[in-house]
Amino acid sequence: MTDTAAQRHHRLQAHADLLTQTLRGIEKEGLRVDHQGVLARTAHPAGLGAALTNAHVTTDYSEALLELITGTHTEVDSLLGELRDTHRYVYGVLEGEYIWNQSMPATLPPEADIPIAWYGTSNTGMLKHVYRRGLAERYGKTMQCIAGVHYNFSLPDALWDVLVPDAPTPQARRSRGYISLIRNFTRYSWLLMYLFGSAPALAREFMRGRDHLLETLDPSTLYLPYATSLRMSDLGYQNKAQSRLKLCYNDLDTFLGRLYEAVTEPWPAYQAIGTRRDGQWIQLNTNVLQIENEYYSSIRPKRATGRCERPITALAERGVQYVEVRCLDIDPLTPEGISAETARFVDAFLLFCATSDSPFFPDNGYCQRSADNFAVVVKEGRKPGLMLDREGQAVSVPQWGHELLDQIAPYAALYDQALGGDAYAAALAAQRAKLDQPDLTPSARVLAALREGNVSFHDYSLDLSRRHADALRAQPLPAERTQAYAEAARQSVAEQLRLEQSDAVDFDTYVAHYHAALKNPLPSTAS
């Protein structure tokens, strides 16, 4: 007997209290810039501890690209409260610098002068640093300075028992459920880009030396008039090696098998670069992907890993633990880069994706139609009359969007039922208005501010970042919270030193061990 979305929703309704155990966490990136909005060339501030080992504040690609990390929370308000507190602590440490509250970068120095993140001399730290050197060789440093908000989301095992009752084990139910969620996310994530895309413009110099079809808004600003998120377009992420990757989202085994091929298959252009230059490591290997995290996607199945454990192996042996949504732009109008309204809508959207019917993609497990819909929305999602392809039928953005919101509404209602109040319904209602009035979308609001203020992308973004900084600094943390962050920073420095002093093998051997830790996932029984 076929298990339908209506039946799953009915079962979910009977167990709505389990939704109080939904966990969500945020990783929010942001470039450090000086008072002129130029990328900071300073080292990671000592008051933030060691980027390698601080659980609250680390760095992403560049030494200047902060990543603020929350713990997991069962409520959106406490989640954003922690993110706000971390921002406030960081601003208590930064001297003469701001966090650039835009996804597209600030003024960048010449490519060679963009500093790669440094994590100390331990083998673990050097692995992270050399991986980033490899990214510079493969994609250039400029692209790596793009920032975003990553939203981590998980449902309790007891809820997967309700939603996927026919799988044989808790691990199988969980993994099958998350992969089903990812397929639906792939189908419908164009809607997130329309509603929350906030990057329709960028600084002209970001495109230095590259061909593009962007239009000129002012002498220093490029844009597309109906774009929602140039960050998620192909502007910066053009790469022949990755473009041929078509990972399968029909089942976890096949997904991991294809990812395994990518991290073990040599790529001629990278072989030509080699792994060393002048005796220094410049990339971890010459394969299509150095490591799993190099694969660029709008959502990832995730599993926490131990030291030196490979993500593929962890997923194959223990299954999917949560999903990481990677397509959200920084909200430039919000000091924390994401609003509670956005977070609640994403919760309801992901629950809808987990519960809705999720047919398999074609035999190769990749849906070109969904990729095409996503690509057109990020570049011209607000274009009047724009049509998308829904199962071979043309449909307008407002029509399909409203139909999706109608389908998501019952899941927003379930969260309100479980948590009390009507915050989820209100979050959904705000998105309906954006479908009816495209000028209400954040991408349209950014362009309107640039035009009406007769101001460049750079000056607008710097002014916003300054104002957010002033607002956060005007609300200093309570002494005990400041002390807790400071103690975590001190402990992270001690932990980095311990790692540096405890390495028992040289870096070459460590890299060999790291590669050897990767197991072929195909014999796995996880499904």
Swiss-Prot record:
Among SUPFAM superfamilies, the record links this protein to: Glutamine synthetase/guanido kinase
Q: Which UniProt keywords apply?
A: ATP-binding, Glutathione biosynthesis, Ligase, Nucleotide-binding
Q: Which residues cross the membrane?
A: none
Q: In which pathway does it act?
A: Sulfur metabolism; glutathione biosynthesis; glutathione from L-cysteine and L-glutamate: step 1/2
State the Gene Ontology terms under molecular function: ATP binding; glutamate-cysteine ligase activity; metal ion binding
Question: Cellular component GO terms, alphabetically?
Answer: cytosol
Query: Which EC class, in a word?
Result: ligase
Example GO biological process: glutathione biosynthetic process
InterPro entries attached to this UniProt entry: Gln_synth/guanido_kin_cat_dom, Glu_cys_ligase, Glut_cys_ligase
Write down the EC number.
6.3.2.2
Gene3D superfamilies reported in the protein's UniProt record = 3.30.590.20
What Pfam family does this protein match (any one)? Glu_cys_ligase
Name the domain of life this protein comes from.
Bacteria
Catalytically driven reaction(s): L-cysteine + L-glutamate + ATP = gamma-L-glutamyl-L-cysteine + ADP + phosphate + H(+)
- Report the PANTHER family cross-referenced here: GLUTAMATE--CYSTEINE LIGASE
What family is this? Answer: Belongs to the glutamate--cysteine ligase type 1 family. Type 1 subfamily.
Q: What is this protein called?
A: Glutamate--cysteine ligase
Q: Record the organism.
A: Bordetella parapertussis (strain 12822 / ATCC BAA-587 / NCTC 13253)
